[in-house]
Design a protein with these regions (language model features):
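Aromatic/acidic polysaccharide-binding cleft in carbohydrate-active enzymes
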Residues: 287-374, 378-381
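Noncatalytic carbohydrate-binding groove/subsite architecture in carbohydrate-active enzymes
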Residues: 143-146, 176-301, 306-309, 316
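Conserved beta-strand positions
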Residues: 43, 77, 128, 159, ...
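Conserved, mostly hydrophobic/aromatic
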Residues: 41, 75, 157, 162, ...
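Carbohydrate-binding surface patches
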Residues: 366-410, 416-425, 469-472
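Fungal secretory targeting signals
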Residues: 1-22
Length: 476
């Protein structure tokens, strides 16, 4: 594919207020460092073998992200069904379960060595979620031994998924009320037992795995880890986050930059708790709306949310984000199934923006629908700027905003790639492009001629226009 350098795109639209963003010449002192592979994928436990063996786009789209990031994106294998799964050493297949409909997730399942062989075939970092809810620690230790022997690129093991949802009727609770304190005691006890089963292995657990910000938090669990001398088992703390659900789905609110800023801010104290122990904080499972609620998850707008959410999260110290891919054929927020889906464009653009980055800083105040991020290389020089107009556009007259950038180090021109679509509500790929290109459904590779916009710079100053529900990645 050849690169086409085009004039700055001039769009007939309704123009709104103008903004000015100044690009700092260096990143802020004490800013969070960016992980080389911040964009990851979480795959529902029972469905993982089919993602690898029956969906060619899994490897293709992971390879597309690798091409941009320079390393394979990390994957996490887990979810609700990890706490329904037991290891069976005699099982010849990867998994065994029955469901009434292919759209359903199983209520119970078993997995064998073949499952972990498939996980071990992935050359990037892998996190594996194992069962704690059923209170069979010996079975989990047996599974962990197979994980250790088969998964060469193992990052961590999770012991249970979203334990804040455990109930007193679950085996792990022994008929008692399940509280954050009970869970913390259970987590450290299981960490000790599994470590002993793995010859006193250290730094192997991704702890927490919560979906709650009240009492089931990294702060509270970290305190218990310190109290019991268990921090040596922990490699990272993680949380899960879905900002919306079927009962409150609203695409305009989902993509709103100010709402995204507020949502990520709720995790700042948990990031700090992990950092105080020199450990990473991970968003171990996340996506736009639980169970793809309300029809918003398959849209281009969800891709815009992914883009801004990744930028905001990495800036705030969340090292990696794992976007969940659920039941094949019944997954509204999935990035691919038999074809590439609209949200993948947001993930890809975030990977473009953060590739090789060491730090980022926010140029806006975080209280409006207009966002700006400056991205810095390893030497502390600004190399890219991401601008985002989160005004919601579905139909009718499309508004735009003028943004003036100052402090640009280039003397004459810079180039840019525009992420755009016919509307925030677009599903599939119709009308979506990044730099004028779209992803091939069979290859997950960009197709068509690249359209790089050229932006004039005068005395370190440039002006760009961005329509509602668009983003612009500028290369300095």
């Amino acid at each position: 594919m050849r690169s086409l350098i085009a004039p700055l795109l001039l769009i007939s639209a309704k123009w709104t207020n103008a903004l000015t963003f100044e690009i700092p010449s260096s990143p802020p002192a004490g800013g969070n460092k960016i992980d080389p592979t911040p964009v990851g994928v979480s795959i529902e436990f029972f469905a993982f073998p089919d993602y690898i063996e029956k969906l060619p786009l899994t490897n293709a789209c992971l390879a597309t992200l690798e091409d941009v990031l320079g390393a394979k994106p990390p994957i996490r294998i887990g979810g609700t069904t990890q706490d329904r799964a037991l290891y069976d050493a005699s099982l010849q297949s990867a998994v065994d379960y029955t469901v009434d409909s292919p759209d359903d997730a199983p209520d119970s399942l078993t997995f064998g060595d073949r499952f972990m062989e498939l996980a071990g075939s992935y050359e990037g970092e892998v996190t594996i979620g194992l069962n704690r809810r059923l209170d069979d620690v010996e079975n989990t230790i047996a599974a962990a031994k197979v994980v250790q022997s088969k998964v060469g690129n193992l990052y961590a093991i999770e012991l249970g998924n979203e334990p804040n949802f455990f109930k007193s009727s679950d085996p792990i609770a022994h008929g008692e009320a399940w509280t954050a304190a009970a869970d913390a005691a259970s987590q450290v006890s299981w960490q000790t037992s599994v470590s002993e089963g793995l010859d006193n292995k250290q730094s192997f657990v991704q702890a927490g795995v919560f979906f709650d910000t009240e009492s089931f938090t990294a702060e509270n669990l970290a305190a218990k880890e310190e109290e019991t001398g268990s921090t040596g088992y922990v490699r990272s703390f993680c949380h899960h986050f879905y900002p919306q659900s079927s009962s409150n789905a609203n695409l305009s609110r989902l993509i709103d930059h100010a709402d995204i800023v507020d949502g990520v801010a709720t995790f700042e104290s948990q990031v700090a708790a992990a950092q105080q122990l020199n450990l990473d904080f991970i968003m171990g499972e996340t996506n736009s709306a639980t169970q793809g609620g309300g029809g918003i998850s398959p849209t281009y707008g969800a891709g815009l949310w992914i883009l801004d959410y990744i930028m905001q999260s990495t800036m705030k110290g969340i090292q990696q984000l794992f976007f969940h891919q659920g039941t094949i054929g019944n997954c509204q927020y999935c990035w691919w199934q038999d074809s590439v889906n609209a949200p993948f464009y947001g993930a890809y653009t975030a990977a473009l923006a953060l590739s090789g980055a060491s730090q980022i800083t926010q140029l806006d105040a975080g209280d409006s629908r207009y966002a700006g991020y400056a991205i810095y290389d390893g030497d502390g020089h600004p190399t890219r700027v991401l601008l985002y107009n989160s005004d919601y556009y579905a139909s009718g007259t499309r508004s735009s905003i003028n943004i003036t950038l100052t402090g640009i180090p280039s003397s004459s021109t810079v180039s840019a790639k525009r992420l755009t679509a016919d509307a925030a509500t677009v599903v599939g790929q119709e009308g979506i492009s990044i730099g004028g290109q779209a992803f091939g459904d069979g290859s997950c590779e960009l197709e068509g001629e690249e359209d790089r916009e050229t932006i004039a710079v005068e005395n370190g100053r440039a002006e760009v226009g961005i329509r509602a529900s668009e983003a612009l990645l500028i290369y300095l």
